[in-house]
Amino acid sequence: MAATLDSRGVPHPAPRPMSSEEKKVIFASSLGTVFEWYDFYLYGSLAAIIAKQFFSGLDAGAAFIFALLAFAAGFLVRPFGAIVFGRLGDMIGRKYTFLVTILIMGLSTFIVGLLPSYATIGVAAPVILIALRMLQGLALGGEYGGAATYVAEHSPHGKRGAYTSWIQTTATLGLFLSLLVILGVREGMGEAVFNDWGWRIPFLVSILLLGVSVWIRLSLSESPAFQKMKAEGKTSKAPLSESFGQWKNLKIVILALVGLTAGQAVVWYSGQFYALFFLTAQLKVDATTANLMIAAALLIGTPFFVVFGTLSDKIGRKPIIMAGCLLAVVTYFPVFKMLTEAANPDLARAQATAGVTVTADPATCSFQGNPVAREIDFRSSCDIAKRYLVQNSVSYENVAGAPGSKAVVKIGDKTIEAPVGNVVNLKFDEGSAKEIAAFKKSVAEDLKVAGYPAKADPAKMNKVLTVLLLFWLVLLVTMVYGPIAAMLVEMFPTRIRYTSMSLPYHIGNGWFGGLLPTTAFAIVASTGNMYNGLWYPIIIAGVTLVVGTLFIRETKNVDIYAND
């Protein structure tokens, strides 16, 4: 049978092992993803320490919130980085653009380790920290699109899914690297020293990873597809207007976001970060144990990025990604409920035998998910009751009470009326403070009697089943994420590929995915049900499933050398 030809008139090569040059391309491109997730896990793991170092002029609660907002700033600006660096990548080339992105990203991480604290330079410290986070977010906005485009344009026909899927595996490497450095430094110098200044070391040692990344990327050549296009004088002079100003391309960008990356992102974050937060915040599993179980699930699951990437070269990208979204929609609720039974059986039993309800006048109940509200802002009887339950991760059902009535908490067959708080000079007055303290004590005692545990009991935990359930969540991640880079690359023409694929990827992963933990826990806090946060990823994944199935075509046989 005659060999098929690409748009260059070159026969598609027969299957062969990966060459040393291709291995170098994948390795160099993947280092940026390692850097991205190394920093991500560092900042997330050290958020409490960073809050004390850079936001110490605020009260403890507000400091932690602003530390998380600084964290979120990096996500929010990623789409803008996609526009800036995507444009450069389509105009001057992939190689030098994603060399610039890793320099900015790496130096931003390194400088955090040098940044003086609030105690030293005052308000300049948090301002500079947020600026560094935004710089890094901008660079990250150009990094993934560059890496995916570069690897795909170096990949032989029939191997793009397999080759680009290696980029996704490095997120796990970033996690393990950050855990190794944090644990090593913390154990080596002790908790007190680590909290004082030792936390800087994990940020500072990132300069070594940056040095290796830059050295390797400098030795790479430009992608064949871009070289061909440049030689023919077909590079885009205005990739932004071509990508987003022409409906035929803008339509594909919108479809890529709604029908691919939004669902991929929420499945990704649900399977790793939300699962971790659910274990620690809702199921009260010790943080070290939870991290180790997540790490075990990732270790088992990571090879499946390549498995599904390779499989997508044979059966297509679309069916695998859509199947991952479908399985997420169908299995999230039962899997997370099984997690409760496996990781904290005492809690599962208490919820089944002594459910908690809050009966209150809905008009007196505030939104419990407000991240900047102070304790005194929750002063109604309803707010005081729900606030205590939310802070102690106790699920409850809402029952509408009579207008003007005080809130009543029912635990099994016990009922406790919540007081109303009276605020004087920005604090609860003495009488209110005593009543609130007595209410909290009564609720705590009744919860204990009803069997609600203060924390998960390691002796009763089914660790094997917990890891298997977490592995299932990671497996769904590999299904939606393994083939995604190849599919995004194949959806857009070479001349505007970097720009066009970067924006939907980073809106999906920066906004829909990056803000998932905050959004999901706000839903939990507002509704009182520990599982209701799952509605956010389920709805988004469901929308992606419908739009992707109906409106996105298969791309595995697309000729990426075509410029039309």
Language-model regions, residue ranges each:
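Low-complexity, proline/glycine-enriched hydrophobic segments characteristic of transmembrane helices
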Residues: 337-468
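Multi-pass alpha-helical transporter architecture, strongest
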Residues: 213-220, 335-342, 540-564
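C-terminal ends and interior cores of transmembrane alpha-helices
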Residues: 56, 103-122, 327-349, 449-457
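Glycine-rich segments within core transmembrane alpha-helices of 12-TM secondary carriers
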Residues: 139, 161-186, 209, 335, ...
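Extracellular/periplasmic helix-loop-helix junction of adjacent transmembrane segments
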Residues: 47-78
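Central cavity-lining transmembrane alpha-helices of secondary-active solute carriers
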Residues: 68-87, 106-108, 173, 295-308
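Hydrophobic core of transmembrane alpha-helices in multi-pass small-molecule transporters
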Residues: 115, 121-141, 346-361, 460-479
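Extracytoplasmic gate region of multi-pass secondary transporters
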Residues: 43-44, 249-297, 335-336, 363-399, ...
